[in-house]
């Protein structure tokens, strides 16, 4: 269990504070006005008098664009998941080539030490969200989903000096492209919209 936990909900935002073994986490979550994304700003603080080294894992599971169909049509859905990875951003592009012009993405403003896009690899077979295999082993699988359950997870290895804090900004976003401008190369989606969104929030403090 955590050593402490607080949850605050305000107008247009939620904030979650927790601590464990001298590590404090402060998560601010909100959806900006007139933007197709959710911002999660995480501040980690070492409250001890000694350096602390640990790994941070993010996690988001993508839907396949139709909630009812996602939960029923498994013989089809489990064969269509598709992703791209570019730096610290994971793109979900299921059915983008065939019949869609929109995609979603999950990014972080930091270099990553690993990633996963397959839920089975990240969680482990027949495992749940309580203790994912990647977290247990402290090692992401660098999996690239092809079908099954596409997710986005980043691994970031961190060392904080005594009293040091570090901010991470995670963005879960959505973007669309004109029908005739969907790709920049074979099987490489146009990412202009996704590239613009993080730039708008580099000022967050």
Name every feature range the model reports, one short phrase each.
Residues 178-180:
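Short glycine/proline/serine/threonine-rich loop/turn segments at secondary-structure transition edges
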Residues 1, 6-24, 76-162:
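Trp/Gly-enriched beta-strand surface patches
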Residues 30-33, 97-98, 110-111, 174:
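A short, sequence-level motif marking secondary-structure junctions
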Residues 202-203:
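Conserved small/polar residues in nucleotide/adenosyl-binding loops
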Residues 52, 158-176:
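Short Pro-Gly-centered flexible turn/kink motifs
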Residues 20-64, 159:
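Acidic, contiguous internal or C-terminal segments within carbohydrate-active enzymes
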Residues 55-91:
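An exposed, glycine/acidic-rich loop-and-rim segment of catalytic or binding clefts
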């Amino acid at each position: 269990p955590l050593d402490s936990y607080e949850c605050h909900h305000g107008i247009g935002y939620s904030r979650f504070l927790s601590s464990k073994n001298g590590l404090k986490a402060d998560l601010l979550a909100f959806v900006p006005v007139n933007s197709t994304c959710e911002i999660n700003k995480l501040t980690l603080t070492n409250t001890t008098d000694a350096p602390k080294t640990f790994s941070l894992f993010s996690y988001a599971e993508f839907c396949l664009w139709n909630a009812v169909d996602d939960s029923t049509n498994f013989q089809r859905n489990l064969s269509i998941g598709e992703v791209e990875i570019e730096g610290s951003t994971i793109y979900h592009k299921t059915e983008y080539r065939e019949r869609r012009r929109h995609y979603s993405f999950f990014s972080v403003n930091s270099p990553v030490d690993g990633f996963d896009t397959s839920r089975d690899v990240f969680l482990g077979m027949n495992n749940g969200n309580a203790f994912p295999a990647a977290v247990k082993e402290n090692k992401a699988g660098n999996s690239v989903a092809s079908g099954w359950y596409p997710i986005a997870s980043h691994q970031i290895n961190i060392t904080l000096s005594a009293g040091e804090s570090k901010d991470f900004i995670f963005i879960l976003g959505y973007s669309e492209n004109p029908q005739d401008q969907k790709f920049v190369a074979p099987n490489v989606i146009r990412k202009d919209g996704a590239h613009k969104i993080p730039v708008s929030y580099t000022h967050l403090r």
